[in-house]
Curated annotation (Swiss-Prot):
A Pfam family hit: RRF
Species this chain originates from: Cupriavidus taiwanensis (strain DSM 17343 / BCRC 17206 / CCUG 44338 / CIP 107171 / LMG 19424 / R1) (Ralstonia taiwanensis (strain LMG 19424))
Name the UniProt record assigns to this protein: Ribosome-recycling factor
PANTHER family recorded: MITOCHONDRIAL RIBOSOME RECYCLING FACTOR PSEUDO 1, RIBOSOME RECYCLING FACTOR
Function statement: Responsible for the release of ribosomes from messenger RNA at the termination of protein biosynthesis. May increase the efficiency of translation by recycling ribosomes from one round of translation to another.
Length: 186
């Protein structure tokens, strides 16, 4: 394994950490409706639990309302129950075959709690990125010990991985600022 391989591997893993963080942020509810909010909701479909997206079409009626239209009429009540029970504080209302899910307004206290959650998630993502940097640096040391690369190449590789780390930590900070702004917007 060379310096370039180690750097490329570290960058790919850091990118995956960012994508996982982005997915975690999407699950945090703001006052605005988005279809990804219901992604983790599981519905009892003839005895087995399946994601809501497999039994219903999910869309947006407006900025504060999600619409859920089950593909089978008899699934309406099961889907509504699953949404109500999914610890997001949502209160769905059925209108015929369509379930409307209005987004309740967030209280100031809840907004502050959510910002703390976002910061905690961000810290976890930063730690993951830094651990990947450490792993890459250990790989460089191993390559020097095996006399595969020189100490100068090790230093260059460490500097490049540090630049990657700084880039991804800055990206996490940017995403946090964006999410906090979204949460605090009334």
């Amino acid at each position: 394994m060379s310096v370039a391989d180690t750097k490329k591997s570290a960058e790919q893993k850091m990118q995956k950490s960012i994508e996982a963080f982005k997915a975690d942020l999407a699950k945090i509810r703001t006052g605005r409706a988005h279809t990804g909010l219901l992604d983790h909701v599981q519905v009892d479909y003839y005895g087995s639990m399946v994601p809501i997206s497999q039994v219903a079409a999910i869309g947006l009626a407006d900025a504060r309302t999600i619409t859920v239209q089950p593909w089978e009429k008899k699934m309406v009540s099961a889907v509504e129950k699953a949404i109500r029970d999914c610890d997001l504080g949502l209160n769905p209302a059925t209108m015929g075959e369509v379930i409307r899910v209005p987004m309740p307004a967030l209280t100031e206290e809840r907004r502050k709690e959510l910002t703390k959650v976002v910061k905690g998630e961000a810290e976890g993502a930063k730690v993951a990125v830094r651990n990947l940097r450490r792993d890459a640096n250990e790989q460089f040391k191993k390559l020097v010990k095996d006399k595969t690369i020189s100490e100068d190449e090790e230093r260059r590789g460490q500097d490049e991985v540090q630049k990657l780390t700084d880039k991804y930590v800055a990206e996490i900070d940017r995403m946090v600022a964006e999410k906090e702004k979204e949460i605090m917007t009334v």
